[in-house]
């Protein structure tokens, strides 16, 4: 695959670059990989957390192994310029939600966590992603709820909670991209939140609504895949 130019890929060929939902990349399910994404996202203190990075300076924070994780901007649209090792897959969120016992101490069970994450993610509509100008289709099909997993929050974590280990469940829309050819690629990610979200909040929810991570902001990644 090295050296292949993906700038002219079509809707018919784009699926070649995306892991299918029933696949097990690197012998793990999609759901297990999404839990790994959350564990990574919360492991980085806020001052270096890629979710609050406007330039791509911190793309490589705590990244290791065959999969790198990409996150949307939490605050405003951004363009991030990142260097990615060759032969590395990319797991990116298109808007995701997560509920933990640390954030919601009133929740008492696994079922409560599942319902909380689902209720938040139900507000997400029309996730969008494009690779080198070609839109990736059928992203609504890539909504995944995880199993129960542990997260460890460091000091100065992005939840602004005391450092601790807790349990969580996530629900979200994702895109899992196979290793890209060496060269430069543009990946654009965006989720949308339903117009009636404010009404849902005002009418009272079963859980205090924090909103899906990422909201309506477009995040553009300019990715350079380098020979190792």
Residue positions per predicted region:
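N-terminal segment immediately downstream of the Sec signal-peptide cleavage site
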Residues: 5-64, 215-217, 223-228
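Conserved aromatic-histidine-acidic binding/catalytic patches
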Residues: 21-25, 80, 172-178
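Extracellular-facing segments of soluble proteins and assemblies that are Gly/Ser/Thr-biased and enriched
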Residues: 66-155
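Beta-strand-connecting loops/turns
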Residues: 87, 182-183
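A short tyrosine-centered beta-strand micro-motif
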Residues: 92, 185-187
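Extended, well-structured beta-strand/loop surface patches
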Residues: 125-182, 190-225
């Amino acid at each position: 695959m090295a050296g292949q130019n993906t700038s002219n890929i079509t809707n018919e060929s784009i699926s070649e670059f995306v892991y299918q939902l029933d696949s097990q990349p690197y012998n793990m399910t999609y759901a297990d990989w999404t839990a790994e994404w959350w564990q990574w996202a919360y492991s980085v203190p806020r001052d270096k957390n890629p979710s609050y990075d406007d330039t791509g300076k911190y793309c490589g924070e705590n990244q290791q192994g065959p999969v790198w994780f990409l996150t949307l901007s939490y605050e405003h649209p951004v363009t991030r310029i990142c260097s990615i090792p060759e032969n590395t897959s990319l797991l990116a969120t298109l808007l995701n939600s997560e509920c933990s016992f640390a954030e919601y101490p009133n929740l008492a069970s696994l079922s409560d966590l599942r319902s909380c994450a689902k209720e938040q993610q139900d507000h997400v509509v029309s996730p969008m992603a494009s690779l080198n100008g070609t839109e990736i289709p059928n992203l609504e099909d890539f909504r995944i709820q995880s199993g129960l997993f542990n997260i460890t929050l460091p000091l100065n974590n992005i939840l602004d909670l005391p450092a601790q280990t807790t349990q969580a469940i996530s629900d979200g829309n994702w895109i899992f991209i196979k290793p890209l050819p060496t060269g430069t690629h543009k990946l654009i990610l965006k989720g949308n939140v339903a117009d009636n979200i404010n009404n849902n909040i005002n009418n009272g929810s079963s859980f205090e609504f924090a909103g899906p991570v990422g909201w309506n902001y477009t995040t553009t990644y300019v990715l350079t895949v380098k020979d190792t």
